[in-house]
Amino acid sequence: HNTMDVEYYGPNPQMGVWYLGALRAAEEMARYLGEDDFAARCRNLFERGKAWIDENLFNGEYYEHQIRPLKDKSEIAPSLLIGMGAKDPTKPDYQLGPGCLVDQLVGQYMAHVCGLGYLLEPVNVRQTLRSIMKYNLRENMYGHFNCMRSFALGDESALLMASYPKERPKNPFSYFSEVMTGFEYTAAVGMLYEGQMDDGLK
């Protein structure tokens, strides 16, 4: 379950990059405490996870979610089947899928803030931020249809929660067409860290 109020089935950048950041933070804390074996374990998991995400989730423009439905609903305890996307995990609705998520690099943003360095290949991070501006930015909201909550109107510009430049799932996650300032902030700060000043300040 995640901050989009949905269950994502399969590896996705938002949770994956948070995980990489947690591994790096745990490594640093373990080294400080003299727990070198645990630090090495965290580093090994981080390096393997980083390589896997860059190789498997980066599509050349941004990181995307690989939807992996369960083969059998009984693989998850019934008490954990809550919220959107939980009705039938063998055919889950409300998934991100191939969308360009506004805060897919939120873990990278926090890693920079905490001095933990890059969690992914820097060239991929920079390209992803450019893609977020390319696909998610709306200069105004006049022609934008949103069947959910509206937090920007008229001539206000904003970054959509997600865009679908190639294909969209039949039932994407519910908030994809909304805009939310906090999520925009993580993308903007990420752009500033990468020297994309004009985009970040926009």
List PLM regions with ranges.
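Hydrophobic, small-residue-rich alpha-helical packing segments that form membrane-like cores
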Residues: 1-58, 68-72
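Extended glycan-interaction surfaces of carbohydrate-active proteins
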Residues: 1-10, 54-180, 202
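Well-ordered alpha-helical scaffold segments within catalytic/enzyme domains
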Residues: 18-36, 103, 107-120, 185-196
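Conserved positions within tetratricopeptide repeat
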Residues: 40-43, 47, 126, 198-201
